[in-house]
Amino acid sequence: MPIVRWLLLKSAVRGSSLIGKAHPCLRSIAAHPRYLSNVYSPPAGVSRSLRINVMWKQSKLTPPRFVKIMNRRPLFTETSHACAKCQKTSQLLNKTPNREILPDNVVPLHYDLTVEPDFKTFKFEGSVKIELKINNPAIDTVTLNTVDTDIHSAKIGDVTSSEIISEEEQQVTTFAFPKGTMSSFKGNAFLDIKFTGILNDNMAGFYRAKYEDKLTGETKYMATTQMEPTDARRAFPCFDEPNLKASFAITLVSDPSLTHLSNMDVKNEYVKDGKKVTLFNTTPKMSTYLVAFIVAELKYVESKNFRIPVRVYATPGNEKHGQFAADLTAKTLAFFEKTFGIQYPLPKMDNVAVHEFSAGAMENWGLVTYRVVDLLLDKDNSTLDRIQRVAEVVQHELAHQWFGNLVTMDWWEGLWLNEGFATWMSWYSCNEFQPEWKVWEQYVTDTLQHALSLDSLRSSHPIEVPVKKADEINQIFDAISYSKGASLLRMISKWLGEETFIKGVSQYLNKFKYGNAKTEDLWDALADASGKDVRSVMNIWTKKVGFPVISVSEDGNGKITFRQNRYLSTADVKPDEDKTIYPVFLALKTKNGVDSSVVLSERSKTIELEDPTFFKVNSEQSGIYITSYTDERWAKLGQQADLLSVEDRVGLVADVKTLSASGYTSTTNFLNLVSKWNNEKSFVVWDQIINSISSMKSTWLFEPKETQDALDNFTKQLISGMTHHLGWEFKSSDSFSTQRLKVTMFGAACAARDADVEKAALKMFTDYCSGNKEAIPALIKPIVFNTVARVGGAENYEKVYKIYLDPISNDEKLAALRSLGRFKEPKLLERTLGYLFDGTVLNQDIYIPMQGMRAHQEGVEALWNWVKKNWDELVKRLPPGLSMLGSVVTLGTSGFTSMQKIDEIKKFFATKSTKGFDQSLAQSLDTITSKAQWVNRDRDVVNKYLKENGYY
């Protein structure tokens, strides 16, 4: 839903005359010079005094007519010039510096909410009755959050609001009541509001999701919600802050044929005046961002393996693919109850597949919503990655039922307490249920590397990042809150011991259940459980940005010196950026085992090893840092793979590539190390090797073709032996590890243009399109589609496009869509880009073909040109206040590798508002800078290496 930013002072009235006396604060704010430039710009020659008079005349209202003041300033801030009558309201905001929060003269205790969507007008009628605790009866105003809401009436008891003042930019509405209203109540007060909202199509608040009925082919809509972080205010007037918890009793009204769902189970349901009315039981005390309700045609499957109903809902014809998630949900809830020693408190658990969904999933208490592909699973037609993805997403959202729902962060800088814990717990439970997946090994190449990649940018942020206002919150739902947060928890669990860690977490959850907590509360609980000073050690990691590189030097006689410095991918750390001393657990691995006692808590430290022939820092990659060795040590470690665990081998590959990219070591050290590991048996290590080579190839994307061909030749020589040994026949008797290894090697060989493998892939595709639907194993279907796209041609494009329109599974649909972006021909690229706005591709999926375009020069250029040309439409479809525009900006810009492109990108956005995605843009520019510096620095040395080793 586009956020309409009003710059003029306007009156929104339900009548004709504008007479009477306005609230004094209205006049004070409108007239104060601080607001004038943002509120009303008069024609040339109009005097300043006349401008004030015009605004004042426009703002005069007779109750109960309404005025909206919509400007770029808050109604009340620490320095607002409110009138004396309302000065106390202004002062209420001073209690929390650097945050724009609601006044606390009243706080919510309970909501009775009724909503009725209209699928013809795409609006909804609503009423909400909020029980308020009155903290300051001297103040006769109530301020709460609203967005795109048409308020019809508001009253407390029998007293109607005299004025309603909406501040669109701040997303608040203030209801003013006659003097003495609040003091007349002996107990709590009840605020009744009637309103109309927009059933928008922007995947925020209460919105409509379009889909094609699988059984009839009709276009239909479901009405669903996405409230996090601050979009409950789009669905109903509320106190939309995480620490303003309350209980909710929700009622839904619609056509009787539709299913009604909400957080709780049904209390009563009946038909009145031809409409179905469903009343749900009252929720526990919870935050507004967890409120959820759905009105749609739905069917379900269920699992009876838990003490309460566990269901997976989907639109008719899709529900059969929900059984995997239903069974996993039942098993996971039981596991988490046992792990935490706290019972899941709600009477049911519903999971719902939503057709248009901006995120992967949302942990609404008792009613978790998902993107379709992240919940429904056709195991016979899905990749291993998809199976694992569904499992991890489901378990992530179920972990939130405790982390986030039962205990909620006090404010958004504590988001990592929600997301970091849920990420760590999803890996923890996956490892319990599927040990053959080797998730803790995959963690190193997945979660940890994602965290380090983003945190190596100058534009990164601390785990606990200050958040002032609503439009800043979406930008911190990133790899820092999720992946670095989870990595920090893994580091703590290794330090304290897993059993002690879980014990402390359980104490934390029990102490703060149904309430809010801060990071320090977690540290204190872990300290109580372990007896260690957790707070002083871990506060540095959460409150400071970045991570260190540990440089290791040797004197040749057994003395090893470790030195820490802030790491940046651009390797240009300034002195004022290198002041933090991180507490680093060195976890030194030698032939005698692992010494976990060595902690680097100063700039440098020297120790002595009896036998320095073998050692590795950061055993199992449990620490959040990278290690830089001497060239000689890199060479030795490359030859000592048999002494290293899978995590250690993955860590070595990741570290040497990262250090090559930033210039801490030569890229030849990376190429030399991986070239010796052509007999590696672990799919996890191979994943990291291939990912690292792919990262290098993306940096060399705009280099001459012969250089790119030489890199492909290097890859072919490295992987061909293992690829051809394994083959590409997938058997049901193959273990998970064997299947994953086959997929990884087959994909790498196709990308490197191994002639035999490419030929096999193309034959599979030909046979598949000729009617043999078994010709392409589901596990490698995306690889085959990408290979076909790289070969190109209009005929192949038509075949892939047809698969996208009529897929046999959601997995296949997305694989085909992504591969459409891999076709290089200009006309085909133009055609793919055209689908993004003509309804062929859902808004939630427009980034998918963009991912394919980033694989080749032509796509990177075409995508950027399209972004520039269609910028206004992008902003309209993907409002900056939501999250997807930032993703599109990143995809549209970060594929470049030259400083010249940085100048061009900066010039384009210099005339645009970057509000809501400024951090994404800064990170993208940092990424381009890093790549440009890498290729400029090591171009010659890489060319020399490739030529000397016969790859040209």
From Swiss-Prot:
Q: Which Pfam families match?
A: ERAP1_C (PF11838), Peptidase_M1 (PF01433), Peptidase_M1_N (PF17900)
Instruction: Recite the UniProt keywords alphabetically.
Output: Aminopeptidase, Cytoplasm, Glycoprotein, Hydrolase, Metal-binding, Metalloprotease, Mitochondrion, Periplasm, Protease, Transit peptide, Zinc
Transit sequence range: 1-52
Q: How is the cofactor bound?
A: Binds 1 zinc ion per subunit.
Output the superkingdom of the source species.
Eukaryota
> Where, in this chain's numbering, is Zn(2+) bound?
H396, H400, E419
| EC number assigned by the record | 3.4.11.-
| Residues that carry a glycan | N381, N713
| CC terms in the record's Gene Ontology section | cell wall-bounded periplasmic space; cytoplasm; extracellular region; extracellular space; membrane; mitochondrion; nucleus
Where substrate is bound, by residue? E228, G360, A361, M362, E363, N364
Chief location bin: periplasm
Q: Which cofactors are reported in the record for this sequence? A: Zn(2+)
Primary enzyme class: hydrolase
Query: Which residues of this protein are catalytic?
Result: E397 (proton acceptor)
Entries under PANTHER family matching the protein: PROTEASE M1 ZINC METALLOPROTEASE, PUROMYCIN-SENSITIVE AMINOPEPTIDASE-RELATED
Instruction: State the family named in the UniProt similarity comment for this chain.
Output: Belongs to the peptidase M1 family.
The misc remark on file is: Present with 2910 molecules/cell in log phase SD medium.
Q: What is this protein called?
A: Aminopeptidase 2, mitochondrial
Species this protein is from: Saccharomyces cerevisiae (strain ATCC 204508 / S288c)
The root-end lineage is: Eukaryota, Fungi, Dikarya, Ascomycota, Saccharomycotina
